[in-house]
Amino acid sequence: MTIFLKQKYPIIFSYSLLIVIFCQGSSEGYGYKKNDDPIITVFKSVIFYGKKSDWERINTDIDTISDRIDDVKNIFAVDLRPELNAGLSQHDFQKVVKVMANLVYLTIKEKYYWNISEGLRMFTRAKVRLRLADEYYTLLLSGNVRKYDKLNGTKYHDEIFNKFTEARNTLGSTGFLGAGAVSPKLKDFEIVTKDIEQKLLIVFPYFESGKEIAY
């Protein structure tokens, strides 16, 4: 079901109010500490150096995630480069931040894509990917979702937060030495993660979501 809501005010990506949560830990299997994932570090860098109008640094940092831009293009047929390059050449900070936010959304989708492609059979990988998707949302997108909720009287942030909890519960468990293992619920995972995607598209209607994947 498609939901249409009339916003009381236009949503402008509130980079100046971006809340970054610092926490300890490591992303097993990916080799990154929390908050050290390239998507997170480059997004934060774009915000920081954008406010200083350091476009040389912004270009340099975005170049380090060219492979991630290519990844989402190859999977979802969304080429973010033309709009991103336009924003960079025009020194249009708002445009660059919007494209970066779109990249975050597509990277969240990419985590779901690989989990679904593997049928949730690789428990540790599936758990790490989902946690990264949750971090991307919490650190980089949730501030604007909360702002949207405040303007429109919605509760999308709470709903998305709860959906991530539901998604974790669908992964099952390896148990202890195989005892007490719980099988994953792939169909439930697909439904829950699709709901997260749809809610984000309501808040960020300018996001390109790409082609639907047939598994």
Per-region residue spans from a language model:
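Bacterial N-terminal signal peptides that target proteins for export
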Residues: I3-F13
